[in-house]
Amino acid sequence: MAPPAAAPELGSCCICLDAITGAARALPCLHAFCLACIRRWLEGRPTCPLCKAPVQSLIHSVASDECFEEIPVGGGPGADGALEPDAAVIWGEDYDAGPIDLTAADGEASGAGGEAGAADGSEAGGGAGGAEEAGEARGAGAGRAAGAAGGRAGRGADAAQEFIDRVARGPRLPLLPNTPEHGPGAPYLRRVVEWVEGALVGSFAVTARELAAMTDYVMAMLAECGFDDDGLADAMEPLIGEDDAPAFVRSLLFVAARCVTVGPSHLIPQQSAPPGGRGVVFLDTSDSDSEGSEDDSWSESEESSSGLSTSDLTAIDDTETEPETDAEVESRRTRGASGAARARRPAERQYVSTRGRQTPAVQPAPRSLARRPCGRAAAVSAPPSSRSRGGRRDPRLPAAPRAAPAAQARACSPEPREEGRGAGLGVAAGETAGWGAGSEEGRGERRARLLGEAGPPRVQARRRRRTELDRAPTPAPAPAPAPAPISTVIDLTANAPARPADPAPAAAPGPASAGAQIGTPAAAAAVTAAAAAPSVARSSAPSPAVTAAATSTAAAISTRAPTPSPAGRAPAADPRRAGAPALAGAARAEVGRNGNPGRERRPASAMARGDLDPGPESSAQKRRRTEMEVAAWVRESLLGTPRRSSAALAPQPGGRQGPSLAGLLGRCSGGSAWRQ
């Protein structure tokens, strides 16, 4: 028997949710299902899975309008005009108590078999002609037992063969070969495959692969030959053997018949089926008098096939609350608070009409409220609470007016804050001016207003310090001394004495003291003495002669005319041509030699305002100070004139005292030539 063909044009089966295989239609609704699926469904539910209508028969293998097969479901007459006897079980999944005992016979059959055995025994005893009665009795008993055993065996074999023939003739499920994975072709054939495997393992010593191949061969031959015992025996002879093939085939067909049979007793529709099994029922609203008992019985039912109860339907005009009587009002007043609350509850079938009323839609609270502080969450108006019938809405507080930006700035300004509680005032002012204003600002503004307009405490302290610095009175800057044009490089290092710079151009003589002219050794000595005056003043015991000489030399320099600068150079562009910057650079070099670290130097703004503490330097100030130090070092070390070897050595501690400044000045003023 070939496997049933698939019918994809019919769609999918609503039972197995797969493509319909071996299409079968249920009568009278004509819904299509798989033949195996609908038979399994009808085993316990004689109704259509889709419309719940009772199924009378199944139509399958339809070739044309005249060529098809019909399987009666509702206990219809069989081929011989009589009802088929009750079958064993369906699907082969419900008989866990073991195989059916086909050798068991009823009392009448047993009696008949016993009588037949007794007759045979008496005949045998009469034919033997034994003289002794004991021998006759033993012979009669043995003949009776043999006759009973033969009768039971013959009746059992006949019953098994009759069962196989009846299943082969009647409605049954198809026999299918195994799958490529060596599994049963259908779930109901699992018991057949298990029986075949057990029989082969008991007869042959095979491996798992050989057992799977032999089982596939047996199931393929069973699906091809069906219940044809002669053809199946011929197919099994090469595998089982000629002697054992008939018994194996008979047992195989009996097990297969039990698995594919469909018993009519399992398909009889229930007598007391609920109204839900009637399928689709159309409600007739016409005023016809042809209403039978069926309609009356249907109206008594509370539920239809769709689960809708029409007894609960109420007209829209009848949904108003019934007014309470005087007795009910009096009893409600006397029952107290608990009784009143219980009486105000609506009854089981009490309806409230909402016609003509607009119930405000409850707006869900925004998700951002979960991330806001408690103050703001409380300030946001809550959605309207549900009210009972006849009640009033809860009074809503008026919204707080939004403060103007100027008012918010005044409330959060640093003026009213004191030294110890600036952050607290900022938070309070931010909550007062910001959280009740609304939710139009962004997340950054909400965070700033949560901390106050002044920000976190670190930012508040910085702003407060800057405010104090800005409001502090700035002292008037000291007038810078006019730069005196000099032409001598001042070097205050210990090993380099004062030396003249590049040869200065000749200039017209001016009113200078002692008739000294610019460019002469005397003028150079005077300039050197004027430049060395600060260093001499810092010494421990300056001599009066040196002080007088330095003073007279400085006066002589201040009264002379300015020296013209070389061609192509501005007078103030070169730091060596300006007296004040050179002195400042020398002072910085001196401070560095004295051991004062650069980090402890105060910036110019702090030195101008010595009474205020500028606090820690910022990164920009540190970078600016470093740049200034590097520029000063470059001017002093790289841009200066290379030092020349000098005979005058710096005084060593503990050594001989070197020549003094007065001696040098006297030597230069005496007209001696300048020694390199």
Curated annotation (Swiss-Prot):
Taxonomic lineage is: Viruses, Duplodnaviria, Heunggongvirae, Peploviricota, Herviviricetes
GO cellular component terms, semicolon-separated: host cell nucleus; host cell PML body
Q: Which gene encodes it?
A: BICP0
Output this protein's name: E3 ubiquitin-protein ligase ICP0
- Protein task: Evades nuclear antiviral defenses triggered by dsDNA viruses. Acts during the initial stages of lytic infection and the reactivation of latent viral genome. Prevents the antiviral effect of nuclear bodies by degrading host PML and SP100.
Q: Which reaction does it catalyse?
A: S-ubiquitinyl-[E2 ubiquitin-conjugating enzyme]-L-cysteine + [acceptor protein]-L-lysine = [E2 ubiquitin-conjugating enzyme]-L-cysteine + N(6)-ubiquitinyl-[acceptor protein]-L-lysine
Bias (Basic and acidic residues) occurs at 440-450
Database matches in Pfam families = zf-RING_2
**EC number annotated for this UniProt entry:** 2.3.2.27
Identify the keywords attached in UniProt to this record, alphabetized: Activator, DNA-binding, Early protein, Host-virus interaction, Inhibition of host innate immune response by virus, Inhibition of host IRF3 by virus, Inhibition of host mitotic exit by virus, Inhibition of host RLR pathway by virus, Metal-binding, Modulation of host cell cycle by virus, Modulation of host ubiquitin pathway by viral E3 ligase, Modulation of host ubiquitin pathway by virus, Phosphoprotein, Repressor, Transcription, Transcription regulation, Transferase, Ubl conjugation, Ubl conjugation pathway, Viral immunoevasion, Zinc, Zinc-finger
Q: How is it modified after translation?
A: Auto-ubiquitinated. Transactivation activity is possibly regulated through phosphorylation by casein kinase II.
